[in-house]
Amino acid sequence: MPQTPTLVAMFDSSSFHRNLYQSKEESCSELYYQDNNLLSGSLEALIQHLVPNVDYYPDRTYIFTFLLSSRLFIHPSELMARVCHVCMEQQRLNEPGLDKSQVRKIAPKILQLLTEWTETFPYDFRDERMMRNLKDTAHRITNGDEMYRKNVQQIIQNLIRKLASLTQYEELITKINAQSTDRMTVLKTKPQSIQRDIITVCSDPYTVAQQLTHIELERLSYIGPEEFVQAFVQKDPLDNNENCYSDRKKPRNLEAYVEWFNRLSYLVATEICMPVKKKHRARMIEFFIDVARECFNIGNFNSLMAIISGMNMSPVSRLKKTWAKVKTAKFDILEHQMDPSSNFYNYRTALRGAAQRSLTAHSNREKIVIPFCSLLIKDIYFLNEGCTSRLPNGHVNFEKFWELAKQVSEFMTWKQVECPFEKDRKILHYVLTAPIFSEDALYLASYESEGPENHIEKDRWKTLRSALLGRA
């Protein structure tokens, strides 16, 4: 069987624009083409363009792009209802005495569309209205046909499995977050319980980098493509409905992923500021430099940036006597790679290299590309803010959404990679649940290690000692 090309490969194809938008209604005044490329259209016409008929099936890239971007204008449940309505009207599936041979011609295409929707955007179906519409449409087109009925069962079973997996993951994250406590609180109540540090758990930086990659890939895998869009969904002035994402059931996996980045940064800073002796702090810094370097080699840019961010936090960077004992040449190279100047030019070059390696990879290890997530979110945000979603004539600016989908589709490919490294539960548990310092506690630990250098720092030190330790 020929392999179905990945979405990102289809988006990158030189023939993409030529093949993608061969419309079933080329003359439709509601869809605007230029050089055979669909640039804009009314929302209604774009919905029509999504619905297959006997002679037409929309391209995968159009399906992905429209399902991703349409939620800026219309809630997925309403879109599903309208797609179902158009489908019923077009094929007259509501009429009594329906010709079964007519249904057999269109049923596979409708089922294929439903399959693509449920596989790519499964979280849409947490909404009970979506699930009802899915089952209702599927019931109408199966029309007693055993083969189609089995296909529908398979679609729904796969969907339920994905949604159950999401629920389990959300419960796990909640449990992990509940176990992760404030280190200062633990120091006061059970100081003996946190005598360990990361090096006593695992002294091999390469293994730690691999375990960080496990966490990254697991958390990436649960992020739905729509989460990049729903983050900046606002009420459309031409739409009377409520905000498309006011629902309580919307996934928050992207938020959880950003929180993981922040946790890792604070864990790094905590581990460096905790040791009493200068040589132990210097050793910890060098350890994390090696972890960060291995993350870079793996293609794990998110953990790399989190580690660098932790080491650049003021409570850590002010430890001048400690840094004087550190061989910083490797750290300087890593900082150069992640330098934010020129819009992160060096990082973007390294990311392109990793993405190219992934395309020609012979192993899962070579396929790993974990982008610096906050920058990806920022890029998508500015793409959304920099281009209007509606044109003056009321048309949807589809040219913008093609660019949006191109960025998100690349992420979709990267998040599907299976981690090739063996899991070490002990390291994973420590990294995810070890108590960490708050920002104030980090400053206090830093001042306790290397005293204040000026009056401002002295005043802050006194305030923190009083507030956190109850000492003058």
Curated annotation (Swiss-Prot):
Asked whether the keyword Amino-acid biosynthesis is assigned, the reply is no
> What's an example Gene Ontology biological process for this entry?
small GTPase-mediated signal transduction
> What CDD domains does the entry give?
RasGEF (cd00155), REM (cd06224)
- Keyword Cytoplasm set for record: no
User: Residue limits of the N-terminal Ras-GEF domain?
Assistant: 34-164
Q: Where would I find the Ras-GEF domain in this sequence?
A: 204-452
Among the GO molecular function terms of this UniProt record, one is: guanyl-nucleotide exchange factor activity
> Which InterPro entries would you find in this protein's record?
Ras-like_GEF, Ras-like_Gua-exchang_fac_N, Ras_G-nucl-exch_fac_CS, Ras_GEF_dom_sf, RASGEF_cat_dom, RASGEF_cat_dom_sf
Check the record and name the Gene3D superfamilies matching this protein. Ras guanine-nucleotide exchange factors catalytic domain, Son of sevenless (SoS) protein Chain: S domain 1
**Keywords, in A-Z order:** Guanine-nucleotide releasing factor
Which Pfam families does this UniProt record tie to the protein?
Answer: RasGEF, RasGEF_N
Annotated function: Guanine nucleotide exchange factor (GEF) with specificity for rap2a and other Ras family proteins (in vitro).
Which protein is depicted? Ras-GEF domain-containing family member 1B
Organism, as annotated? Xenopus tropicalis
| Highest classification ranks of the organism | Eukaryota, Metazoa, Chordata, Craniata, Vertebrata
